[in-house]
């Protein structure tokens, strides 16, 4: 059985969030939560909350055994990009891109 959770519009670069997502992909959920709890990256907290939501969805909606769940998929996709202006020398300006991410976590029960 598969269950998923989605977090959209996270104000963080997808490239930075993927560094944390790669740590927990394919891990049992208990180990994945421990890894995220002790990871010092900013992306660890929203990914952990999304994983906890996927675990709760599996437990409450599907009746899955939490100890048998594995992080089957974790995808970090790019969201909307906010374009901002930064003043530069000699009256010029440059563009700052404020990137956002969409996180999708899929947990599956292994037998």
UniProtKB/Swiss-Prot annotation:
Listed Pfam families: Ribosomal_L22 (PF00237)
One cellular component term from this protein's GO annotations in UniProt = cytosolic large ribosomal subunit
Query: Does Nucleus show up as a keyword for this record?
Result: no
Q: Set out the biological process GO terms recorded for this chain's protein.
A: translation
Q: Which Gene3D superfamilies match?
A: Ribosomal protein L22/L17
State the source organism's domain of life.
Answer: Bacteria
Q: Which molecular-function annotation in GO is an example for this chain?
A: rRNA binding
Q: Does the keyword RNA-binding apply?
A: yes
What keywords would UniProt list here? Ribonucleoprotein, Ribosomal protein, RNA-binding, rRNA-binding
SUPFAM superfamilies linked: Ribosomal protein L22
> What does the sequence similarity comment in the record state about its family?
Belongs to the universal ribosomal protein uL22 family.
What is known about what this protein does? This protein binds specifically to 23S rRNA; its binding is stimulated by other ribosomal proteins, e.g. L4, L17, and L20. It is important during the early stages of 50S assembly. It makes multiple contacts with different domains of the 23S rRNA in the assembled 50S subunit and ribosome.
Relate the assembly described in the record. Answer: Part of the 50S ribosomal subunit.
- State what protein this is by name: Large ribosomal subunit protein uL22
């Amino acid at each position: 059985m598969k269950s998923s959770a989605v977090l959209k519009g996270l104000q963080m670069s997808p490239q930075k969030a993927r560094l944390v997502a790669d740590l927990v992909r394919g891990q049992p959920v208990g180990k994945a939560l421990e890894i995220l709890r002790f990871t010092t990256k900013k992306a660890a907290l929203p990914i952990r909350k999304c994983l906890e939501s996927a675990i709760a969805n599996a437990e409450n909606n599907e009746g899955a055994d939490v100890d048998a769940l594995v992080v089957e998929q974790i995808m970090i996709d790019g969201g909307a990009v906010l374009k901002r202006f930064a003043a530069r020398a000699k009256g010029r300006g440059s563009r700052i891109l404020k990137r956002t991410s969409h996180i999708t976590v899929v947990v599956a029960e292994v037998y």
